[in-house]
Regions:
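Short acidic active-site motifs
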Residues: 2-3, 53-54
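Short loop->beta-strand "edge-of-pocket" segments that line small-molecule binding or catalytic clefts
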Residues: 5-27
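Short helix-loop-beta junction
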Residues: 32-37
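N-terminal hydrophobic or amphipathic helices and topogenic motifs
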Residues: 2, 11-13, 112-132
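Periplasmic-binding protein-like
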Residues: 78-107, 122-132
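A ligand-binding cleft/hinge motif common to bilobed small-molecule-binding domains
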Residues: 55-84
Length: 132
């Protein structure tokens, strides 16, 4: 498996994420962009609710492939093919920016993210005004 269109192989059993997840939104958006009918994917309707549950389904032999995050795949001895980078923000009231606990939070995120495969903390000192 190297790309979304590889899921069209009927011999490949797919395990999906639930419809409300960001992972599912990523998949469904990719399918629309590539003109792929989800009903042609073997297992598209089989859903799990966490990245770990997807990994466990693959390990249990219930599926051959599913979408998930790198650290969960590697923790479970599974292969990983990156499809997309995502950017997350920390949202807080302006008053919190000068609070010492906010600085501690940023340091912890930097420390933790550097230890988890697939994650990196970038631009944590940059403030984004009116990002909504």
């Amino acid at each position: 498996i190297h790309a979304i269109e590889d899921l069209l192989n009927p011999k490949i059993r797919f395990i999906n994420r639930q419809i409300s997840s960001g992972t599912r939104l990523l998949l469904d958006t990719s399918l629309i962009e590539q003109g792929i009918d989800p009903s042609e994917i073997n297992g598209y309707l089989h859903e799990e609710f966490t990245h770990s549950a997807v990994a466990n389904a693959i390990l249990a032999g219930k599926a051959d492939v599913g979408l998930g995050v790198k650290n969960v795949a590697l923790e479970n001895g599974l292969g990983f093919v990156p499809l997309k980078d995502e950017v997350f923000f920390i949202a807080m009231h302006k008053e919190m920016l000068s609070h010492p606990e906010s600085s501690k939070l940023v340091r912890r995120i930097r420390s933790y993210s550097s230890k988890i495969p697939g994650y990196k903390a970038i631009s944590l000192n940059r403030q984004v005004e009116s990002w909504l």
